[in-house]
RNA sequence: GCCGGGGUGGGGUAGGCGGUUAUCCUUCGGGACUGUGGAUCCCGCGACUCGGGUUCAAAUCUCGGCCCCGGCCCCA
């Protein structure tokens, strides 16, 4: 019988786990300095939580099942919807705005490819019930600062505003559904398909030309002047532009000045309502997008009261990829204790336990190998010290401590040993 | 789903135009260096995805299944 790891999943060994925990720790600390606190939702939810949000077609990409009580459940394919559900169930009546963050794994039944896994992790946050350019700027600042804290170079923040684009479509009286479709194509960046669709939908030449111009507009905040020129009499879009300007100004106060205005960012999701942003690491090619976010309204879709949220999520695995951390030989244990003779095993056990109680990670030679082999193993473990318990030393109330890095050795009084070692670890 | 590549000792690989003892590195176990290692040497454990076919003979050719990886479609 051959049992192996399911397709699209990964095993993480010691060194990689250590790296992931480290990144996780930096993100937690940074989010918490912005006043966010962690929430956790179940790994499986009701299936309809996801179909209501994204449509029936996603069922084919969801790991779903009927439980023993006949309920249709699903392994969560993303975390935005569970967070909205949690808010609606538990926090709807609480004072606003509410800041929360989350970290967890998601599951999708899709064809794996480079960087595309069936189990993947997201680290994200939501600021619920306080939409304003100031709030939005702070969310973007948090995303940017997190990456700076991690020491990531070469990332680009791209910011768009759906209100500008929807203001044009609204003036053409394009129905909601068609607008959503158009947004999807814009997000895809397929210019030809967009032209074809706008023609099919019979958007006026003026608006069509304007849309094409806008989605190709990219650059620093100064391009907003160009955008204003393009917009002319589209009053709804101008209002959104004003909002965008306010965001830009506020970002400056947060110290965020390195970003791209990019109206081609549409996110392709119908529940987004205003600011949208994505973060890229260009050198990663097809997997360059490590973060997506913006302002949206989802709770109403699930039957709650209308409330807008601004948030984002890092693709944790993409982020790890971008950081490219080395998996150096890691120290499995600080101290390796070796009984030189069988008679010294009890003492070796006592020493090991004392070290552990003092917060020093320690392991004991349990295989009965000779000293030579045991020392070799200590090296394999990357142990900083080896402690040798021999009959001679024990008789004298001492213990031999070998520094594995310096290849030096000393004999210490038994009762001073723990403190000495602890002080050097 | 379509296209392409692949599946060889615990890990990584060579072999692949058929030849009958399957290569190399590494991991692991034992031994030699006489209570002390990171080197070296010796011995050992351990393998050709499953099924069928062709053949005196198949890891090597062929048919089918299963599995994995990459590209496309899709990507909440």
Swiss-Prot record:
It comes from the Archaea. InterPro entries: aa-tRNA-synth_II, aa-tRNA-synth_II/BPL/LPL, Anticodon-bd, Anticodon-bd_dom_sf, His-tRNA-ligase, HisRS-like_core, HisRS/HisZ, HisRS_anticodon. PROSITE patterns: AA_TRNA_LIGASE_II (PS50862). Keywords: Aminoacyl-tRNA synthetase, ATP-binding, Cytoplasm, Ligase, Nucleotide-binding, Protein biosynthesis. The keyword ATP-binding applies. GO terms for cellular component: cytoplasm. Gene3D superfamilies: Anticodon-binding domain, Bira Bifunctional Protein, Domain 2. Pfam families: HGTP_anticodon (PF03129), tRNA-synt_His (PF13393). It is found in: Cytoplasm. It catalyses: tRNA(His) + L-histidine + ATP = L-histidyl-tRNA(His) + AMP + diphosphate + H(+). Its EC number is 6.1.1.21. GO terms for biological process: histidyl-tRNA aminoacylation; L-histidine biosynthetic process. The keyword Manganese does not apply. One of its GO terms (molecular function) is ATP binding. Belongs to the class-II aminoacyl-tRNA synthetase family. PANTHER family: HISTIDINE--TRNA LIGASE, MITOCHONDRIAL-RELATED, HISTIDYL-TRNA SYNTHETASE. This is Histidine--tRNA ligase.
